[in-house]
Amino acid sequence: MPLTNVIYCGVCDFPAEYCEFSGKFKRCKAWLQENHPELYTKWYGDVTEDVSKQLAESSIGDEREEKLEKALEKLERKQQAREERELAKKLSSKVVIRREARTKRKCMIAISGLEVFEIDMKKLSKTFASKFATGCSISKNAEKKEEVIVQGDLADEVEAYIHSLLEEKGMKEVKVEVIDAAKKKKKAETTTTPGSENKK
Amino acid sequence: MFRKFTREDIHTRSNVKSSIQRNLKAKLLAQYPKLEEVIDEIIPKKAQIELYKCEGKIQLYLVNGEVLFFQNFDELIPSLRFVHKFPEAFPTVQVDRGAIKFVLAGSNIMCPGLTSPGAKLPEAPGFEKDTIVVINAENKETAMAVGKLLMSTEEIKEINKGHGVEMIHHLGDPLWTFSAD
Ligand SMILES: [Zn+2]
């Protein structure tokens, strides 16, 4: 007895026949057409008008079917709006890498702003710990937001890795800001008053 | 059951010892006898079952990083990914098209959604109360949810009011989207 092989949608991850309920139907259909054209033709035909008629041959009757279609359309609009909002938020946010002095010779790197980009900080800290063979932890900063702390002077390496991670997630345009607080502090001792460097 | 489940709810992860692994498989078979013919394909003899102990006494069992079944009390409950591999093994009911949206939102299933023309219940004697059932939908081939009968299928037909199935796990819930890594 062979195992069943279900086709999961590459967009919404539902079994493809449930895409209409995912709120991402338009993109789901485009995916199906690309990846499983025979199923696309079978389910949605060439003319989209026929689709709703085909689907309307369900037991729940025209009126309820129409209501359902409307609800599903609304779901899709909502989903789209939400995704747009999320994307806008991501694009207007940035990751901040701060180099801080720990002792006179040693420093550490604090990375904040990751939560917006759905980057798993626990995983990232494990990756850094093994990649750079150093101590790495998660702690809360002054704004009570979590940040990843890497021990050692690794700002450049961390920056490169964060860039590659963002690119992997299709968010190449996201800004990564590097602040060298360790250096500034030294300068601060001689030239400016402390506090002014925090403004940046 | 998984409405609010997140990675943070996983307390410990461990490998299941081979003796216990055998017991687990035997238990699965006792509960779902039709799995007999495919069990070694789904959980190969050499596979390592992992156990994730989670908040709320939920235990997830994974093979190759995929949750195959889980446990809250005594019974083993298949994940949808497992059900999809071999749906014949599980007691199944079907809801009408109108109920799909609500099931996917995590609601319990009302009796009329199980007795209307687009729905399907087994013929008498049917399934007992508390049976773990797979939930299919009108005009769909794959299962969309797993639940527990709040009354026997005969009672559902007879009473036809109120909640018939308690929702446990559905397409799109955090268990469905969970990935081990
Ligand atoms: Zn889809």
From Swiss-Prot, chain A:
InterPro entries: DENR/SUI1_TIF (IPR050318), DENR_C (IPR046447), DENR_eukaryotes (IPR005873), DENR_N (IPR048517), SUI1 (IPR001950), SUI1_dom_sf (IPR036877)
Encoding gene, per UniProt annotation: TMA22
Domain notes for this protein: The SUI1 domain may be involved in RNA binding.
SUPFAM superfamilies recorded: eIF1-like
CDD domains on file: DENR_C (cd11607)
Entry GO CC: cytoplasm; ribonucleoprotein complex; ribosome
Stretches assigned to the SUI1 domain: 95-166
UniProt KW keywords: Cytoplasm, Ribonucleoprotein, Ribosomal protein
Family membership: Belongs to the DENR family.
Protein name: Translation machinery-associated protein 22
GO molecular function, one term: translation initiation factor activity
GO biological process: formation of translation preinitiation complex; translation reinitiation
Subcellular location: Cytoplasm
Pfam families tied to this protein: DENR_N, SUI1
